[in-house]
Amino acid sequence: MMVVKKMIKTIRVMLIPNNKQNTKLFRYANTARFAYNWALGREKENYKNGGKFLSDSDLRKEFTQLKKTEEYSWLNEVSNNVTKQAIKDACHAYKRFFKGCSKFPKFKSRKFSIPSFYQDNVKIQFSDTHVKIEGFAASKKKNKQKINWIRLAEKNRIPTDCNYSNPRIRYDGINWWITVGIEYEDSVTVPSNDGIGIDLGIKDLAICSDGNKYKNINKTKKVKKLEKQKRRLQRSISRSYENNKQGKEYCKTKNVIKKEKLLLILNHRLTNIRHNH
């Protein structure tokens, strides 16, 4: 028996921006981080003074007045929806803390936080090969590549004729990625009464009573080789920090930065292998 249900499926695709687009993406992410930290700071200050919870609508009105000042006029260079959603996210995180669902929200550090920002689900546009980012100005010169359309790494991966939900763009330290939810009809098969036994192990991930075996991805030669390279690189980075230590402070040299970039690439490869298994 088949049952049709409407579901939201998340699709994640890598972006291939040019230099100008890359600069713009970082500007959007930094502005979103600033708006998040500002909203969180206002909530903490208000709570310390004995005030009630500030709603995101009140904070957005206050933020609009802040953008009109000369000191913060640079905030107008970024789409309004980016900062609006960042303030909403800060208020949501603050509410979750008081409901006991999560820890107290922390300020986003420029050094350690993941650069990311929101895109309006109505204004964002997709073609077979590109995505149009809201607020990115188009190039006026015919011989220049359009700035507002960013190339997608996978062709025809995201459908162009459907409703999108919660589009987010984030940077993982190597590449930019766009994540978007799409609604689709899923045919769900009603399970039968037949049972199956599953034996979880170390050599094999799982052995089923019907004879099917599922390999443990961590036992493959490729993953073992990458894990060995990772351990050696981690030890090398640790030695570099110790050798360049100045008193009680660790000094990050250009060589350490290169090694940490290689470590990031190794972790990225291992994550992709396990994700696709």
Description of each model-found segment:
Residues 1-277:
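Nucleic-acid substrate recognition interfaces
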